[in-house]
Every structure is written in C-alpha cells, then in structure tokens.
Amino acid sequence: MIEADRLIQPQLQGQDDVVDRAMRPKLLDEYTGQDDTRAQLKVFIQAAKNRNEALDHMLIYGPPGLGKTTLAMIVANEMGVNIKSTSGPVLEKAGDLAALLTNLESGDVLFIDEIHRLSPVVEEILYPAMEDYQLDIMIGEGPAARSIKLDLPPFTLVGATTRAGALTSPLRARFGIPLRLEFYNIKDLSTIVTRSAQVMGLEIDTEGAFEIARRSRGTPRIANRLLRRVRDYAEVKHDGAITQFVADHALDLLDVDNEGFDYMDRKLMLAIIDKFMGGPVGLDNLAAAIGEERETIEDVLEPFLIQQGFIQRTPRGRIATARAYQHFQLIKPE
C-alpha cells in the first residue's frame, strides 16, 4: 500500500503546519503567485474598508497545499480584524458552531477548512448566520421547546475546500466571493523557495531555488518541504549553501525526479505502458497491477499526472500519453 508520508504529497504531514506558519506571508503585497486572485482580493478588501463593512463571504477552493489557509489569514490581516479557525469535521453539533459564532466581534473572519465535510445539521445553522447575521437556536425539549433568534455581528465566513463540487448548492450559493487557486508556475515557486530560505537563514542561489521549484509539483507546501530536506543534505554533504548542483543531487537521493515524480508516479505510468501496452486500461485492472486501491489512484496518484498531461482518463480507461513515453525515453507505438 502507498506510504502515508510521500515526500511529494500535498497534504500536511509531520512538522509542515508549524513550518508553514513561520513562512506564511502576512499581507497581499508579500503573497507570491495567484495574480488574478490577488488582484480581485485587493479590490474587494479596499471596497469593504471604504464602506466600513465586513467583507463578503468567501469560498477558496483548489488542490491541497496551495495556500488557502494563508489567504484566509491575509484577509483578516488586511481587514484589521481577528480570525477564528476551525474545520468541517470538528463541528459535529449545532452547538459547536453556535459557540464560535456568538464569540465573533464585528468584522471578524471565521475560517472553516474542509467546509465540504460539514454535517447537514451544522450547515442548516450556517444559512441564516451567513444571510441575515442571525442564529436560530432551540431552547428546551419536547413540547416546551421553542426557537429564538440571536443577532450576530456582521462577520466574514471564509470556507476552504479541495472539493468544491462536494458542497451543497444552497451553501455554495451563499458565498459572494468564490476564488479558485491554481498550481503555481516555476518562476513563482522559485520566489517562494528563495523567500523561505531567507526566513530559515539559508544561503541559496537562483539556480538552486529553481531546481527545487521545478520538482515541487506546482505546490508551495511541497516546495518548502523539499527545501528543508535539501538543507539537510547541504549541511551534511557540503558547506550548507544550496546550489543547483547540491539541490540536484539531494533530490535525486530523495528519488524526486525532474518532473517532481516519485517511485509511485513512475510505477503507475510504467504499468500502463509496459503491462497494458499504453492503455486504455480500466481502473480495477490498473489497481491490481500496481497493488493499490482504486481510491488511492483516483485521489492521490492520478490528479497531478493528468493535470500535467502524462496520462489521460477516457471512457474506456487510462491511457499513457506521448509525454509519458518521452519521460522514460521510450517511443510511443503508432
């Protein structure tokens, strides 16, 4: 079965959360990449501040590790308000959400990560809170139970999700500002790596930052994780400075190739090429061939390979593209 701690997985692992917090930009002007999103946010935030209003509710969605939590914190900083953070699975009962809402001050940001995992009971409480800044709660039980409304101060709900399609339509419709985060280009990732190295007090040159960036799968969280491992290699095997030579050898040692693929990515592509003549191959057959569950292939391995154009998902099954053959220096049969 697939390792839970693949070096190039975008989900949080180990000390990621602590390190990410230390390296997070605090303001939009410090934030690198996502140019369209950044430009939109600058306008929305300035308009809300000019009107002395709470910012409209915001849904941030996209693959993991791209900075959804960071953006939520930047919004609070730019608005000059407090932020309270939680996640969908934590809010099990209506009372859990009510406790958070009643402790908000005017203009505050409530950040809910994995908002697609909210229970229906909690979601029902959220609707009037988002629309009318009111909280409907039940007092008492049985025939004596009655509903009362509590007024809430204007606040901004920022929801984050990797699966926007899993949100119910009523919840999705209540977000006035939907923002999609895209994978980062190598230039922006190089800037992020350089900034993180400065925060960590590391010596790194432009080529060293580029080498780490191009193997980071378009994801800042992976870039920062690889930077920490390259630092270890540089300190033990060299003088601590990160150059292209040092980064290249460190990442080769870590089995992260020039495209950011690891053993499992290559195993999947080679199974399609060698065992199924390039495809198409059904998901169940592919899962059996590489000894993985179909959900692991769909949710963990495939997305980046498809996004980068190395495999295709068709009605008849998975196909290895010409780019996959080129990666292994093979000739795609006609």
Swiss-Prot record:
EC number: 3.6.4.-
Keyword DNA damage belongs to the record: yes
Gene behind the chain: ruvB
InterPro entries per the UniProt record, alphabetical: AAA+_ATPase (IPR003593), AAA_lid_4 (IPR041445), DNA_helicase_Holl-junc_RuvB (IPR004605), P-loop_NTPase (IPR027417), RuvB-like_N (IPR008824), RuvB_C (IPR008823), WH-like_DNA-bd_sf (IPR036388), WH_DNA-bd_sf (IPR036390)
Cross-referenced SMART domains: AAA
Region listing for Large ATPase domain (RuvB-L), in residue ranges: 4-184
Reaction it catalyzes: ATP + H2O = ADP + phosphate + H(+)
Binding site for ATP: 24, 65, 68-70, 131-133, 174, 184, 221
Subunit structure: Homohexamer. Forms an RuvA(8)-RuvB(12)-Holliday junction (HJ) complex. HJ DNA is sandwiched between 2 RuvA tetramers; dsDNA enters through RuvA and exits via RuvB. An RuvB hexamer assembles on each DNA strand where it exits the tetramer. Each RuvB hexamer is contacted by two RuvA subunits (via domain III) on 2 adjacent RuvB subunits; this complex drives branch migration. In the full resolvosome a probable DNA-RuvA(4)-RuvB(12)-RuvC(2) complex forms which resolves the HJ.
Residue numbers binding Mg(2+): 69
Protein name per its UniProtKB record: Holliday junction branch migration complex subunit RuvB
